[in-house]
Amino acid sequence: MPKMKSNKSVAARFKLTGSGQLKRTRPGKRHKLSKRSSQQKRNLSKQPLVDQGQVGMYKRMMLV
């Protein structure tokens, strides 16, 4: 049986922390930032944690 492949799009979007939680990036930080305030852009840089109800699904997709 061949090796299982991880979902590359999920692996690129999420980072696994040391405690087993997943960090994600916020959307809206790529282009057209001139209309946003400095505070908005700074808050978009923060990486929130994924909700606990979805962590298991994403970990299975990442083969962790």
Swiss-Prot record:
Domain of life, per lineage: Bacteria
Pfam families: Ribosomal_L35p (PF01632)
Record carries keyword Ribonucleoprotein: yes
One MF annotation (Gene Ontology) recorded for this entry: structural constituent of ribosome
Xref: Gene3D superfamilies: 4.10.410.60
Region feature Disordered, mapped onto this chain: 1-55
PROSITE patterns (alphabetical): RIBOSOMAL_L35
Keyword terms, alphabetized: Ribonucleoprotein, Ribosomal protein
Gene Ontology annotations for the cellular component aspect, listed alphabetically: cytosolic large ribosomal subunit
Swiss-Prot/TrEMBL GO biological process terms: translation
Key word Ribonucleoprotein present: yes
Compositionally biased region (Basic residues): 23-39
NCBIfam families with a match to the protein in the record: rpmI_bact (TIGR00001)
Recorded family membership: Belongs to the bacterial ribosomal protein bL35 family.
Protein name, UniProt field: Large ribosomal subunit protein bL35
Natural source organism: Chlamydia trachomatis serovar D (strain ATCC VR-885 / DSM 19411 / UW-3/Cx)
Lineage: Bacteria, Pseudomonadati, Chlamydiota, Chlamydiia, Chlamydiales
